[in-house]
Amino acid sequence: MQEIMQFVGRHPILSIAWIALLVAVLVTTFKSLTSKVKVITRGEATRLINKEDAVVVDLRQRDDFRKGHIAGSINLLPSEIKANNVGELEKHKDKPVIVVDGSGMQCQEPANALTKAGFAQVFVLKEGVAGWAGENLPLVRGK
């Protein structure tokens, strides 16, 4: 214990950085464990789409969506979800909803908004459309 105190005394900035990092990891872990939105793999997404008639919500810009999207996807912008302007998605509240974007990094907030709007099962696709395409899974062009 004495060595730890000496280290902290000699390296306060490094010690604060380590404590901040530890707190960030703990908060992130706690949030992911208590979140109603779960991150799923491409295999799990495929199973949900094929077996449970899941609906895919693509958050990318319209041009990116037209260049290639998962078959049957509904294109909604995060701002539309935030404003609760979900249109045709409204009738799918009881089905699993898979939220995707380009990389899977910007999906959590819109997915949480869908959960708050009453959607029962909301998932986020890990690595988004980039991971989907990287595994040579089918993409539909146009529309």
UniProtKB/Swiss-Prot annotation:
Q: Where is the Rhodanese domain?
A: 50-143
Q: Which UniProt keywords apply?
A: Acetylation
Report the residues modified as N6-acetyllysine.
91
Q: Mind telling me which GO cellular component terms the entry cites?
A: cytosol
Query: What is the designated name of this protein?
Result: Uncharacterized protein YibN
